[in-house]
Amino acid sequence: MDAQLTYTMGLLEQGYLSARVCSMGNSTSRLYSALAKTLSSSAAVSQELLEASQHDQSEPLDPKELLDECQVALQDRPARLHRDFFSLRSESSSQQPRTFRVMQWNILAQALGEGKDNFIMCPMEALKWEERKYLILEEILMYQPDVLCLQEVDHYFDTFQPILSRLGYQCTFLAKPWSPCLDVEHNNGPDGCALFFLQDRFQLVNSAKIRLSARTLKTNQVAIAETLQCCETGRQLCFAVTHLKARTGWERFRLAQGSDLLDNLESITQGATVPLIICGDFNADPTEEVYKRFASSSLNLNSAYKLLSEDGESEPPYTTWKIRTTGESCHTLDYIWYSQHALRVNAALGLPTEEQIGPNRLPSFNYPSDHLSLVCDFSFNEDPARLL
């Protein structure tokens, strides 16, 4: 308890945790406030009850009709960023493997976009939720992932869970214990990580919600890990989504969080017996120790987007590009890690060019987040020599 109090006071002193969160305006918002207090057992029960309610009998949505609806709502905005998929299969591959698609995306919490993040080159009109939600949904519907991993989700219960569940996804959400969204007036509740998978492609074997630790201290960052069984092959694999601590000066903290996540995943996957895909905004460029820790892990992980480079060893030049009051920020922070002994990357979605992004960077009228989505097509590796 003393260690927890010390950690909380440290966050208060550093300005990350406010001693006062904004009051909630209605019963739904008050429920979000309760969910943020994950140290309370009653709040944890409330979240579980809410997630259980996702199995309702609502009519399924047609993804094409919903995409059309999004595009009608966005007809006055510039066209979305054009991006192409690049095949990563070797020339010698004769058979077309059955693939599954994974999407990783920090969608930008609405409260942060309109409040704390200070995107000085992005008009406030471009950040309004009434239209921005259609841009986010359009991106998801265009790429139709089988597994979707999101960070900074603060509209889970009123937008993503009800819509995506009707599209056939099973949905899981874990809020940050002390979300910075709660410090923003008129917020929609805490942000957190969410994991969605299509139930006609996978079945849930088990699910773990993880509050990441830095050595012995519980932190404000979380992860979800779910072991799924492929409906077609019967093979199992584990998907994890996370969002590590942001900002310069917290490199050792991120390393501790990443190490804790790897320890948890090693236990869940029984020492990589079950193949693993980890999606996340790591808030760390490839020179950071937490990146090197994942790259050298005993779980035998590789970063999927390195395969787009000419040498197969270099990360993209950026996955986020924004302009704030503190200046321009262009970094690679987002990754899809995978078990390279058991899985193969068949294709990856390319990143837009600087010219496409434009001089005002992200977010913008034609892209809803300051982070770019990452999308990969995977297949199970059938080469027995690589499964050892």
UniProtKB/Swiss-Prot annotation:
Binding site for substrate: E152, K176, P177, W178, N220, H243, L244, K245, A246, D281, F282, N283, H371
Compartment(s): Cytoplasm; Nucleus; Cytoplasm, Perinuclear region; Mitochondrion
Keyword S-adenosyl-L-methionine annotated: no
Full protein name: Nocturnin
Single Gene Ontology BP annotation: circadian rhythm
EC number: 3.1.3.-
Predominant location: cytoplasm
Cofactor binding annotation: Binds 2 magnesium ions, but the ions are only loosely bound to the protein.
A GO molecular-function descriptor: NADPH phosphatase activity
Sorted UniProt keywords: Biological rhythms, Cytoplasm, Hydrolase, Magnesium, Metal-binding, Mitochondrion, Nucleus, Repressor, Transit peptide
Annotated binding of Mg(2+), by residue: E152
Superkingdom classification of source: Eukaryota
Catalytic reaction equation(s): NADP(+) + H2O = phosphate + NAD(+); NADPH + H2O = phosphate + NADH
Listed Gene3D superfamilies: Endonuclease/exonuclease/phosphatase
InterPro entries, A to Z: CCR4/nocturin_mRNA_transcr, Deadenylase_nocturnin, Endo/exonu/phosph_ase_sf, Endo/exonuclease/phosphatase
GO cellular component: mitochondrion; nucleus; perinuclear region of cytoplasm
Top enzyme class: hydrolase
Expression sites by tissue: Expressed only in the photoreceptors of the retina. Expression is controlled by the retinal circadian clock.
Family statement: Belongs to the CCR4/nocturin family.
Cofactor dependency: Mg(2+)
Function: Phosphatase which catalyzes the conversion of NADP(+) to NAD(+) and of NADPH to NADH. Shows a small preference for NADPH over NADP(+). Component of the circadian clock or downstream effector of clock function. Exhibits a high amplitude circadian rhythm with maximal levels in early evening. In constant darkness or constant light, the amplitude of the rhythm decreases.
